[in-house]
Swiss-Prot record:
PANTHER family: HTH-TYPE TRANSCRIPTIONAL ACTIVATOR ALLS (PTHR30579:SF0), TRANSCRIPTIONAL REGULATOR (PTHR30579). It comes from Salmonella typhimurium (strain LT2 / SGSC1412 / ATCC 700720). It holds the Pfam family HTH_1. Residues 19-38 bind DNA. The gene is allS. This is HTH-type transcriptional activator AllS. InterPro entries: LTTR, LysR_subst-bd, Tscrpt_reg_HTH_LysR, WH-like_DNA-bd_sf, WH_DNA-bd_sf. Positive regulator essential for the expression of allD operon. Binds to the allD promoter. Belongs to the LysR transcriptional regulatory family.
Amino acid sequence: MFDPETLRTFISVAETGSFSKAAERLCKTTATISYRIKLLEENTGVGLFFRTTRSVSLTAAGSHLLSQAKDWLAWLDSMPDELRQVNDGVERQVNIVVNNLLYSPQAVASLLSWLNARYPFTQFHFSRQIYMGVWDSLLYEGFSLAIGVTGTEPLANTFMLDPLGSVQWRFVMSADHPLAHVSGPLTEAQLRRFPAINIEDSARTLTKRVAWRLPGQKEIIVPDMETKIAAHLAGVGIGFVPQPLCQTLIDKNELVSCTIPTMRPPSPLSLAWHKFGGGKAVEDIVKLFTQRQPEIAGFLSIFNTVRC
């Protein structure tokens, strides 16, 4: 019923509004075009065109079929190339999760541009997660690869890891915060008076990591690092921020960095992927990272540059 020639005929008639013009486009006779459309209407049991002596126009059913037919025909035309890609070991879908600390719209766009040019028939899905939520996606939610899992050792022996670097932290507050000009290391008693600004771990199955907060201290949860930094600048609260994300603000005297009794150690992050079952797209992404190619440099900027 919906063979490629019939679909092309139907689309041509719909686009030209004429059997004769469709015949010219397809190098067929008008009678052949008319017969194909009549047969299609008989097989579907509905009228697809309103006919006048000079032109034809789509019925409601015809308009619906047109929107579907173009997609079907494009799918049929691309199928040989898609099948060859699958036969060559290329995945039909690749799910990639990115740690919130490494996430950058520009970095994702750069990687997607590179991937889409090489694997036009693969569906790519990116997700942004926080702390153990990155491992959670990889372990339990069908993700193929993770950019920025915590640590340098896998949580299961079915994964491979490539260390990316360690995030350095600074304890900050706004320049006009009451603690900003206190001399010497701050005490817990002094810190406890002000809210800790944190981003909640997005893990759903694994145990969530608890961000810095003293017993009895008020905590304010925000959705991302951009909001956290904005809250610090507004004097809402205090807390740790990656050094490359706040150093420029510290240099401008918009934020102040202080020492507290327990400073946060560097946070090592790694690339992680499944040992078995991966395809060529994942293999190529891994190569980009292990070889530190420019296409993925945006994900690693937090380890070696200052940005605000």
